[in-house]
Structure formats: C-alpha cells, structure tokens
C-alpha cells in the first residue's frame, strides 16, 4: 500500500508547483475515489477536519511553513518515497483530470460543502482548530451516495450547476486596482490549511 507521501510526490511530479492547500485536497480526493471504488484507502494515513478542509497531519509535517511546493519537496530523500502501482496512479490521475485545474481555495470550499468534513467539525466554530479525524467510512459513505455532487464522483466528471455555484459563490468584486476589477476571495480565519 502506498503512503500519503508517495501519493503527494506523484501529484507534485504530475502538476509541478502547487499550493500546499491544493496538494492536501488532491490527496484527500484521490483517497476518497479509492475508497468508493475499491472499499479500501489508497494510503493508511488519515485526514483531520481543519479550518480550510481536510488535512493529513503526516503530509502537513512535511510542508509546514511553505505555501507552494514542488516535486522533491515532500521527501528530499528518494528512498522515503516508493513509486505508485499503475492501479494506485489511476486514482490520482483521474482526480487530477477532474479537479487538477481548481485552485486550493476552490477545493477547500468544495470540501466545506460536503458531509465528511462538516460532520467531523460538529461542535467546532468556523475558525476553531479541530483535530477530529474524518473517518474512511464517512468518506466512502458520502462520496458513494446520491447526495454527493462533487464532479469527481459524477458520471464523466462533469460539473453541475450546484457545484459551479458553490465554487464561485464566495467570489466578489470589491474594488478596482489601476482601473481593473479586483476580485477578492474571503479569507478563512485561522492559520490552518
């Protein structure tokens, strides 16, 4: 079985430099796809319900303090990372195909509208630290259900209007800079990813 570090390094090899928020979410959704299709996780590490969405503590420890990272950043010692099997790569490749063009904040908002993250954060305020684990059972149960409107789990990976609306709803033009509209994405309180 792959580790989350193996998956993260593969994502970075395929994408180049990405935000750590985006990396966390792509790893989360790759694992969710494996759970839905095989009833097994892609890797043994778990995710916690942090302020800005699901975060693997093991992966966070590797990129802590950095906003953008690239290939070789997660495991500078190549012996730490093992190549993924073709089967394991298929989950990551499909996740990247459907969600790879999204920014980290868009993926964060997507996860906020989904039960695994929001249920795990029950009892926590919007900006409270939360270390509650998002269970694999909750992940598989939600993403395999009809309630899920995540484009990765819809036939053909097509966006529907509810997802499009949710991803763009929080964007607003608040001012102009040098005569051009300045688009502002609301800041999420807290320092967590």
Model-based region annotation:
Residues 1-193:
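Domain-edge interaction signal
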């Amino acid at each position: 079985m792959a580790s989350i570090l193996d998956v993260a390094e593969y994502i970075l090899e395929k994408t180049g430099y990405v935000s750590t928020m985006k990396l966390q979410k792509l790893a989360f959704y790759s694992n969710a796809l494996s759970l839905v299709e095989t009833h097994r996780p892609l890797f043994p590490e778990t995710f916690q319900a942090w302020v800005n969405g699901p975060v693997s503590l093991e992966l966070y420890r590797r990129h802590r303090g950095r906003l953008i990272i690239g290939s070789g950043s997660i495991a500078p010692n190549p012996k730490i990372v093992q190549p993924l099997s073709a089967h394991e790569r298929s989950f990551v490749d499909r996740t990247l195909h459907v969600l790879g063009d999204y920014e980290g904040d868009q993926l964060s908002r997507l996860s906020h509208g989904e039960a695994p993250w929001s249920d795990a954060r029950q009892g926590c305020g919007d900006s409270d630290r939360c270390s509650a684990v998002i269970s694999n059972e909750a992940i598989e149960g939600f993403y395999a259900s009809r309630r899920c409107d995540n484009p990765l789990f819809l036939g053909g990976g097509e966006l529907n209007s509810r997802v499009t609306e949710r991803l763009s709803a929080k964007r607003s033009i608040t001012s102009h800079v040098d005569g051009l509209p300045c688009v502002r994405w609301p800041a999420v309180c807290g320092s967590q990813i």
